[in-house]
Amino acid sequence: GKNTWRKEAYPYYKANRKAGRDKSGMDWNALFQIMNNVRSEIKEFFPYKVIHLDHCEADDIIGAVIHEHGSELNIGSEKFLILSADKDFIQLQKYANVDQYDPIRKRWIRHDQPAQYLEEHILKGDTGDGVPNILSPDNCLAVGERQKAMTKKRLALYSEGTQNMDEETLRRFYRNKMMIDLSEIPQKYQDQIRAEYNEEKNIGREHLFNYFIQKKLKHLITDIQDF
């Protein structure tokens, strides 16, 4: 949804994305409108749960659902497949019933130490999302400044715990933890997401045929059983 809670908490979140869109020359408003229409039609006609909430991103929805339904033991638990190349989701692989597949490169994304990966991700930041490492000021990526280097020695020191951080580094650590750790989603949004997810959806497949006819999707009609 628009106006994400991360942007409200940290104004530099994804700050360079808009600049990149402005330079591209693409009509992004038209593209977003098309995406919104497609999402609405999937919600109306397809037998799938579609969750879309203002102030939340897809990461929030996936994170909140999996933190509720994730299981340490892979025994009789509902299985979850995250279809995304985004390595932010590696942290959710701490649950035995969670797997991740990259549909672009057609490969599994798996990590033996998801908790350690998350810890290092927080310390190093996420440049793609405009989140610097914990040694660098909030605005450094937005204004194009170099980050202070996170050397292996510093990484090892800070991995031992927050007791090794001064006050400003500690503040930046919690800044990054809020942006990156999917267990840090504000409770009110977690509750909204889970309520939507757990709501029964009674749309069967009977609407699909008419939808495909209406949209002239003849090539999909022959594969309707796959939906």
Each PLM stretch: what is its role?
Residues 18-222:
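Extended two-metal-dependent nuclease catalytic cores across DNA- and RNA-processing enzymes
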